[in-house]
């Protein structure tokens, strides 16, 4: 959906099957709505920088394999569809994929030797999403370049994810400009076609590529796994766009950190390299070589490598978010348990966390630069400042509150608005000398917050201090203990 002939595209949901004897809503999905909320949290950015949602909705099908039309299915599915649409993205999400649409087309026709890079690139991102990397927005490389050339601020509140751009391309220029102006960028994939200028920007150089079974060394916070998996990465050059050919160029550069390395015998390659310069106004770029941790074993699709036996190369993308201030980690019993899949989208100034939890024994741990996310209607235990959640099988949860507090149980909940000129009230409790950041609705004209006041909440509002350090429109309140009621 990054490039379309016009603005039309389709969302189709699988309720019944007219050929095979199954009704997916009832059996395959088990009446869980993850395949509604996750795709409906996804959006594209057009050439004008606008968010574009699906224009058409279809169902396959309204009748089951026997021609029956049980009322239960539409009665249960339609509310989820309406909720998903009501909270669909209205701005780019936390993470935006700059999809190389034109580049892939040109490689296929003019540089067929690079087709393996196309195959690798899509598989690597697919695996990262399945690992829990919370990306929800896509823009084509052509539209990205156009918007940047026009000076649009479309991506100012997002982290970008891109392939290594071709030498001398306009995309190369605009990606560097984005970082130098304070943006955060992930670059992944083979670097052999990059310019010297871009390699210097990343502070890497290319050497002899290696592939095979390599021992990994991480300087990244990773998931907590009771029975750890392997630290051996299987990098198949055929499935990963070639071998691993990158090392740091200038190891004395104080702005460069090597976050992950791969070792094959006495050969070492730097597979995750982060760089940041003072002149970049907080900008940061992280290069990941990226491994497609999957093997062809016959059939239509690759088979993911067993995490109990092999290191999952796609996990490095999520782990590297930690160094950009976004900590998303899982606590699980063993490596082979499937990770939760997450999307983080934005609507009406809120953050929406949509997801699927294949195994509910897994605990999710979250921390953003602005604090621990406190979902509306949830309680969470804060440990070392991080929010800990055991999520349901499928979910779409609103987050308007972030709390900086080391320990404790914090909750966020709806409070009846009661008054005629109040749209909404939410409460936040369990605070202990906390810094609280609240994202009210887009219309915050009458926003106010009271501390430790019961109904009718007529105590004067705390001083409203609009924050500027982080994404979005939010208000910051410091040294708060007890309960806050936010009103707008």
Language-model region placement:
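A glycine-rich, often tryptophan-bearing local segment used as a flexible ligand/cofactor-contacting loop or short
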Residues: 170-247
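Exposed, low-structure sequence patches enriched in small/polar residues
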Residues: 99, 217-222, 244-249, 272-276, ...
């Amino acid at each position: 959906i990054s490039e379309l002939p016009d603005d039309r595209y389709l969302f189709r949901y699988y309720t019944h099957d007219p050929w095979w004897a199954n009704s997916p809503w009832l059996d395959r999905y088990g009446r869980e709505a993850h395949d509604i909320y996750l795709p409906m949290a996804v959006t594209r950015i057009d050439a004008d920088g606008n968010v574009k949602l699906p224009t058409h909705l279809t169902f396959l099908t309204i009748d089951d394999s026997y021609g029956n039309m049980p009322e239960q299915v539409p009665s249960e599915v339609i509310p989820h569809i309406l909720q998903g649409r009501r909270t669909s993205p209205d701005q780019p999400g936390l993470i935006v994929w700059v999809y190389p649409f034109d580049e892939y087309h040109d490689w296929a026709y003019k540089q067929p030797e690079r087709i393996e890079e196309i195959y690798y690139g899509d598989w690597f991102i697919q695996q990262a999403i399945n690992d829990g990397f919370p990306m929800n927005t896509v823009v084509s490389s052509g539209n990205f370049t156009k918007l940047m050339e026009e000076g649009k601020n479309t991506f100012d509140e997002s982290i970008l994810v891109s392939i290594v751009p071709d030498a001398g391309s306009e995309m190369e220029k605009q990606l560097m400009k984005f970082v130098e102006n304070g943006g955060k960028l992930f670059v992944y994939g083979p670097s052999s076609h990059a310019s010297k200028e871009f390699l210097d920007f990343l502070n890497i150089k290319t050497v002899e590529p290696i592939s095979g079974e390599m021992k990994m060394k991480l300087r990244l916070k990773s998931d907590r796994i009771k029975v750890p998996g392997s630290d051996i990465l299987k990098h198949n050059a055929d499935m990963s766009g070639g071998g691993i050919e990158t090392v740091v160029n200038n190891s004395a550069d104080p702005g460069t950190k090597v976050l992950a390395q791969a070792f094959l015998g006495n050969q070492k390659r730097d597979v995750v390299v982060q760089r940041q310069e003072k002149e970049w106004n907080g900008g940061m770029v992280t290069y990941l070589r990226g491994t497609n941790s999957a093997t062809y074993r016959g059939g239509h699709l690759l088979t993911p490598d067993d995490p109990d036996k092999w290191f999952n190369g796609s996990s490095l993308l999520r782990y590297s978010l930690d160094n950009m201030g976004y900590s998303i980690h899982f606590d699980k019993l063993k490596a082979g348990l499937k990770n939760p899949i997450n999307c983080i989208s934005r609507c009406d100034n809120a953050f929406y966390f949509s997801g699927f939890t294949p195994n509910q024994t897994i605990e999710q741990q979250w921390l953003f630069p602005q604090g621990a996310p406190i979902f509306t209607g949830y309680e969470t235990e804060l440990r070392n400042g991080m929010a800990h959640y055991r999520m349901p099988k499928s979910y779409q949860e609103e987050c308007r509150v972030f709390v900086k507090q080391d320990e404790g149980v914090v909750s966020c909940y709806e409070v009846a608005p009661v008054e005629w000129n109040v749209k909404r009230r939410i409460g936040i409790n369990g605070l202990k000398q906390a810094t609280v950041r609240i994202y009210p609705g887009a219309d915050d004209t009458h926003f106010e917050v009271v501390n430790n006041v019961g109904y009718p909440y007529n105590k004067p509002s705390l001083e409203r201090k609009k924050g500027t350090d982080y994404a979005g429109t939010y208000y910051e309140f410091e040294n708060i203990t007890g309960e806050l009621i936010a009103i707008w």
